[in-house]
């Protein structure tokens, strides 16, 4: 992509897990390759709930789910790094040390197939409810999102979107990414 498009990416979350996911040295090698690209384009690399991998490559941060390493422990392990936390309900929000995280991943907005243990979908109303709890923390919407959803998601209060399936399941991932990036840029102008 031309540099102009890459500026739309605020961060890249490395999420390589599940039965089909790479393991061991193969996973480490892929993470290092992704990190090289991220550094080249000045995009922070966040590792999804793999503390060992995040430490091994000195990632820019880590993203945690509600059942992962505690945010307090993560902040001690990763001082000065970006820490994100998945939050899907008001109860999860109220029971989480939000003041210790840099952003929240809110959702899933829609039912998702990319995560076996996904929580129930919260819909646009759930996204709006989470935004009302705190208008200051950066909020990234997650959960089976596509280009057609971007405008509504941003209007519901999200600051950004996290995508897997909209790109990985696309017939032409490059073209799908281009459409998403161009759409996000058009909305942020």
PLM region spans:
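Catalytic domains of carbohydrate-active enzymes, especially glycoside hydrolases
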Residues: 1-15
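Conserved beta-strand positions in the central sheet of alpha/beta enzyme cores
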Residues: 11-13, 46, 63, 84, ...
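Catalytic cores of alpha/beta
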Residues: 45-60, 88-100, 132-135, 139-140, ...
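Glycine-rich phosphate-binding active-site loops on the catalytic face of alpha/beta enzymes
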Residues: 64-74, 105-118, 150-180
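Alpha-helix-loop-beta-strand connector modules within alpha/beta enzyme cores
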Residues: 27-49, 74-89, 120-147, 180-189
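Glycine-rich, proline-tolerant flexible connector loops at the mouths of alpha/beta enzymes
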Residues: 13-26, 108-116
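Short secondary-structure boundary segments
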Residues: 16, 66, 87-90, 108-109, ...
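Glycine-rich, small/polar surface segments that engage phosphate groups of diverse ligands
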Residues: 49-55, 59-75, 82-84
């Amino acid at each position: 992509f031309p540099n102009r498009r890459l500026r739309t990416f605020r961060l890249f979350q490395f999420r390589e897990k599940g039965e089909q996911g790479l393991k061991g040295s193969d996973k480490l090698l892929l993470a290092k390759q992704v990190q090289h690209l991220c550094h080249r384009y000045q995009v922070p690399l966040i590792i999804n709930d793999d503390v060992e991998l995040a430490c091994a490559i000195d990632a820019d941060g880590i993203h945690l789910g509600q059942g992962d390493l505690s945010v307090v422990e993560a902040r001690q392990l990763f001082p000065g790094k970006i820490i994100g936390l998945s939050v899907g309900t008001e109860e999860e929000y109220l029971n989480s040390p939000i003041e210790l995280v840099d952003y929240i991943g809110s959702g899933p907005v829609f039912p998702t197939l990319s995560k076996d243990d996904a929580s129930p979908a919260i819909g646009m109303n759930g996204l709006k409810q989470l935004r009302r709890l705190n208008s200051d923390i950066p909020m990234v919407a997650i959960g089976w999102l596509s280009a057609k959803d971007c405008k509504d998601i941003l209007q519901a209060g999200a600051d950004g979107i996290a995508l897997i399936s909209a790109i990985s399941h696309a017939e032409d991932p490059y073209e799908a990414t281009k459409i998403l990036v161009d759409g996000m840029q058009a909305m942020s102008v």
